[in-house]
Amino acid sequence: MVRTRKWMLSTTIIAMSSSNSEQKVDVAKLSPEEQKLFRLYGRLPQRKDLLVQKLQQGRKYFDSGDYALNKAGKASDSGITCIGKEIPSPDTIPHRVVSAGSPNKEPSLHTKRPSESSPSGASSRRESVTRHDLESNEN
């Protein structure tokens, strides 16, 4: 009978809850995980679901701006913008299409200006420089 009494004392433990009221806990009826928690912390965890408890507390805000937007009834940009969702490819980037008769057509970088392409303009410049040099040398 002494053995059974020791066994009963070891399986029925009086635990102190957070409200400091005594509560009898039968360790034999607990699951192995609950027994481990009871041995480590000396009390059983609360039975409330953590996710439900967090949802009931209300939304947590990133900063005061999000809080102010929510109080004002305006949407924050958490679901509206889609920055960084997709890596752009040449097929998905809109390109400007220039028609042949468009007045907004930009000149090509490889075409020469009319003043540079005419050989007569270049030769007349050379002649004026040489005349100037000759006149200055004569004086």
Swiss-Prot record:
It holds the Pfam family Endosulfine. One of its GO terms (cellular component) is nucleus. The keyword Lipoprotein does not apply. Residues 124-139 have a biased composition (Basic and acidic residues). InterPro entries: Endosulphine. Residues 83-139 are annotated as: Disordered. Its main location: nucleus. Keywords: Cytoplasm, Nucleus. Plays an essential role in initiation of the G0 program by preventing the degradation of specific nutrient-regulated mRNAs via the 5'-3' mRNA decay pathway. PANTHER family: ENDOSULFINE, ENDOSULFINE, ISOFORM A. Belongs to the endosulfine family. This is mRNA stability protein mug134. It comes from Schizosaccharomyces pombe (strain 972 / ATCC 24843) (Fission yeast).
